[in-house]
């Protein structure tokens, strides 16, 4: 591990399932957990990027190469089948990171009922059904950590993707409801919200000098927040070090809000 990042003994051999792990923040999550010695399985529909993520982990000399399942998260049956396979392959799953999302820009005037449903299904629905598939064996074991990746976009009143922002605001509802339900049986549920974390996709599709300057004007930390830095908060909540944290939301936004 880089000397400036913590190592968590409790994450060695810990079993982790991540949605949307092929690129961006998801890829950073897969790599950072693997570097901790965790046994990681992840799903995504981008096979090329997923294999590249696995190769980076292998090249880094991780103890356990990540396991990949090709899944379109709009297909709940396929997602839950991958969850079941991961339970067998990893010997159980004790950490779930619901990460996959799509923040494509759209004008509210152009949104049809079908497109609205697609935004909800892409950015919210699969969170619940991954929990439904993996939580029972966590509850039976009496231990587990579920980390839902949200977005600060709705807090910041950001414009240009209402379907995404609406779906992401509901992630906090999943977190708090399920934290109350699962807490008595030792399973924690939290939300981690990124601010502006410039991934390859973000930079290619939407970056402008003016947009970055506006972000820097609002951030207390006057630099870009890196995907690996965001991942550190998730690692903490997955580790035993975060054992007293549940039903909370944690912002990693450089003090933007």
Region locations from a protein language model:
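Short C-terminal tail/terminal secondary-structure segment
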Residues: 2-10, 156, 235, 246-257
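Conserved glycine-rich cofactor-binding loop
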Residues: 15, 22-23
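Substrate-binding pocket helix/loop in short-chain dehydrogenase/reductase
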Residues: 107-120, 215
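Active-site helix of classical SDR
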Residues: 131, 167, 175
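C-terminal substrate-recognition "lid" of short-chain dehydrogenase/reductases
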Residues: 131, 143, 223-252
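Alpha-helical segment proximal to the catalytic Tyr-Lys
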Residues: 136, 180-184, 243
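Residue(s) in the substrate-gating loop at a strand-loop-helix junction
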Residues: 151
